[in-house]
From Swiss-Prot:
PANTHER family: TRNA DIMETHYLALLYLTRANSFERASE. It catalyses: adenosine(37) in tRNA + dimethylallyl diphosphate = N(6)-dimethylallyladenosine(37) in tRNA + diphosphate. ATP binds at G2, P3, T4, A5, S6, G7, K8, T9. The record marks T93, R115 as: Interaction with substrate tRNA. Belongs to the IPP transferase family. The lineage of its organism: Bacteria, Pseudomonadati, Pseudomonadota, Gammaproteobacteria, Alteromonadales. This is tRNA dimethylallyltransferase. Catalyzes the transfer of a dimethylallyl group onto the adenine at position 37 in tRNAs that read codons beginning with uridine, leading to the formation of N6-(dimethylallyl)adenosine (i(6)A). Its EC number is 2.5.1.75. Substrate binds at T4, A5, S6, G7, K8, T9. Its cofactor is Mg(2+). It comes from Shewanella sp. (strain MR-4). GO terms for molecular function: ATP binding; tRNA dimethylallyltransferase activity. Keywords: ATP-binding, Magnesium, Nucleotide-binding, Transferase, tRNA processing.
Amino acid sequence: MGPTASGKTALALELAEKHNCEIISVDSALIYRGMDIGSAKPSAEELARGPHRLIDIRDPAESYSAADFRADALREIEQIISMGKTPVLVGGTMMYFKALLEGLSPLPSADEAIRADIQAEADANGWEALHEQLREIDPVSAERIHPNDPQRLSRAIEVYRISGKSLTELTQTKSAPLPYDVVQFAIAPRERKVLHELIGQRFRIMLEQGFIDEVAQLKARGDLHLDLPSMRCVGYRQCWQYLDGEFDYDTMVEKAVAATRQLAKRQLTWLRSWPELNWLESGAEGNLVTLMRQCR
């Protein structure tokens, strides 16, 4: 695991090529078909070297939860182990890693009709009014969720309307943790400025590869919008807004790079508090040797 642009894929491919391993992607952007450039999806050449499971498994119009990931990942892990191989989970979606390792609370699946009702109420009365509703049914979640966070606010109210129980009540029970021995590694540059430079370089390469055309094709479908989880992925939102004429090209680049750096900061914050983690430095010689030594 590690922040975006830290070299996770390169190390995973080296591991898969030289040892009896198969890769499982742990990335909330790579699951979507047609979102290849902006998600830094492994190239056809890289996938030939080391096939990745759990990429291209959803259309961008579809939702995909941490619970969906856990179920899919457990199935893939079992299959890889049954083949006599070692699963290697690689990615930067820390919520997915946490769900897999620790288990999840038994929350109800999304209900599109209820979500539409909640959105209609928000359009009519504002999210502040819905936040007051949440405060009445689940004061603990209301303290934690800001009125300006419509995604989490909507989900908390949706859970109550489906189940009759508050999010706080339901999250007190979790499914069983991962039933396997796990060795955990994080890879990142030692200096933040190096990571920032890598992020800027990678976004410029994405633009050269045709990222704007990729977003334009997604936009032209007509069934996608910026409230979807897929279109909230860093880079895609900013490019979509640029195509809408909200700002110029240079501002789009600046905003996309800044959003990606903020994502990396959040990822590193998660990792610094992560227990039992072995750290590797991006680009350092001998990372594979160090990794294999720790796994023995």
